[in-house]
């Protein structure tokens, strides 16, 4: 009986154990199925689209996967690889985006450059219009005006490029010539007493303008100007000694030219209506422009002299001296103008020099000026000639042979007229390949002393020609 009880208890324990194991197995199978179902659902929701965007479990939100840069997540960071086609599309999109950014930057730079260019053009046009308005007001109302300063300085109307060994220098006629010392070298050699004389000369100009203004105001109010102290109106016999003295002072030293300018300026109120007086006054302004070193003062003298020459031409168009000095002053004033005004002054210079030669063909200075103009034009670059042609209806045309003919004509009319002229002849012959003639004219140039600033400036070029041509 006891054995049967023991056997029954053992069977009951075994059944309980089997039931427990079966329950645990069922729970494990159920949990495994749920876990697999959750994994499959998460994979289906995280599939990537063709544009490499990942859809998250939250609807309406898309996040673009970031590529790990070297050093950000470590070199061992591994991202899920994309199909080959999607990688190519992504690279192309990145290239297009980079190109668009670069293109936008270039467009912005181009826009800023165009704005700057437009502003410069507008400024030049406005300056040109203001200058025209000033000229119109000056002709209508005889009032003096202040001169504007100018810091720019270039060649009168063209810059002749005659080689690497030659530089530009300023001539007696007021326009730039080739083969000379630079402005900086001349500034370093200027003496202090010359500065004082320039200041006195400027004060003289201001006083002369004031006296002229007073006279014009009296005429406008209907008042008669005061008669000269000697009594009576000035006649031919009264003015001729004055004009002869002015001519002598013009041919003299720098101090003599200053005294001649002062003499003419003091007598402008009395003889300012005479053409022969006015062109001499314009010539004196040209002399002062040559003697002055400050750019603003040079422009002021050149502008005043050109105005006097214009008034002289209004009194008669058949005076060769009026045309000659008007041309010279155009060249001097062009040194302080822009490229367009310089080119226009160049054509005006040529026109009035031709008229001066036609009216007085035996004048050596007019032929010398024409030769220098032809020499400079013959050395213009192709781009400079095209620019001048675009700004004017008449094309530029001059050769070294044309310049040589004019220089030889001046030498024929007056042998030894200019040392610079003989140096120009030497250069022309050298450029034409005629070295024996060039050497002969070099020797003739060495015989003449330095008279003008241009002669002194050409001394260095003459020494270089001696080395090139030989003794």
Swiss-Prot record:
GO terms for molecular function: microtubule binding. Residues 41-50 have a biased composition (Low complexity). The chain crosses the membrane at residues 10-32. It is a single-pass membrane protein. Residues 183-193 have a biased composition (Basic and acidic residues). It is found in: Mitochondrion outer membrane; Cytoplasm; Nucleus; Cytoplasm, Cytoskeleton, Spindle. The modification Phosphoserine is found at residues 44, 46, 50, 57, 182, 192, 212, 233. Residues 39-70, 169-206 are annotated as: Disordered. A motif (FFAT) lies at residues 156-162. Residues 90-123 form a coiled coil. Keywords: Apoptosis, Coiled coil, Cytoplasm, Cytoskeleton, Differentiation, Membrane, Microtubule, Mitochondrion, Mitochondrion outer membrane, Nucleus, Phosphoprotein, Transmembrane, Transmembrane helix. Residues 33-471 are cytoplasmic. Residues 1-9 are mitochondrial intermembrane. GO terms for biological process: apoptotic process; cell differentiation; intracellular calcium ion homeostasis. GO terms for cellular component: cytoplasm; mitochondrial outer membrane; mitochondrion; mitotic spindle pole; nucleus; spindle microtubule. The keyword Membrane applies. The modification Phosphothreonine is found at residue 159. Interacts with PTPN2. Interacts with microtubules. Interacts with VAPB. Interacts (via FFAT motif) with MOSPD2 (via MSP domain). Interacts (via phosphorylated FFAT motif) with MOSPD2, VAPA and VAPB. The transmembrane region is required for mitochondrial localization. Involved in cellular calcium homeostasis regulation. May participate in differentiation and apoptosis of keratinocytes. Overexpression induces apoptosis. Belongs to the RMDN family. This is Regulator of microtubule dynamics protein 3. The lineage of its organism: Eukaryota, Metazoa, Chordata, Craniata, Vertebrata.
